[in-house]
Amino acid sequence: MSNKSKGNRAEQLVLDHLISKGMIGEIIETKMRLARGPRGAFLVPDVGEKLGDIFGLMEGKAVLVEVKAVESLTYSILKDHQHDNLRKWYQQGGVAVVAQVKSDGTMFIMPYPMMWIPGENITKYFKP
C-alpha cells in the first residue's frame, strides 16, 4: 500500500471515529475548478493552503486535525508549517488535534499542543 493510500485510509478512520463522537467534519482535499480558455473549458486544481487533514465542528468549537499513519509519532514527523498551523489554531480558541494511526489500526487522538520533546515518541503517554 502506498504512503498516500495509507494516509487516506488513516484520515478516513480518524474522521469516522470523530463523527461517531459527535463531530461534524470532513477531510480537506484540494478542490477542482472549471477554468475557461480560448480552447474551451477544462478542470484545474484549485490550489490553496491546506491547514490540516480534517476540519470539523464539535461542541461548538472549530476542530483542526493533522493525521499521521506512522508506527511511532515523534515531534519531527510533523513539518514546521503543521506545527505552526496547529499552534495558531489553538491560540485562536480552536481545538487542535494530532491523530496517529498504526498499521494494525490502533488509533491515538491527542490534543495539541503537547509537552513534546523533539525526538521523543509522545504516544508512550497515551493508551489507545
List each language-model region with its residue ranges.
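Intrinsically disordered, low-complexity terminal regions enriched in charged/polar residues
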Residues: 108-128
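Short connector loops at helix/strand junctions that flank enzyme active sites
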Residues: 47-51, 58-64, 91-93
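Mg2+/Mn2+-dependent nuclease catalytic core
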Residues: 71-91
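Nucleic-acid nuclease catalytic cores
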Residues: 87-115
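Amphipathic coiled-coil/heptad-repeat helices and related helical stalk/stem segments
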Residues: 11, 50, 79-82
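Conserved catalytic cores of phosphodiester-cleaving nucleases, focusing on short active-site segments
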Residues: 18, 54-72
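Acidic-basic catalytic patches of nuclease active cores, encompassing PD-(D/E)XK
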Residues: 1-45
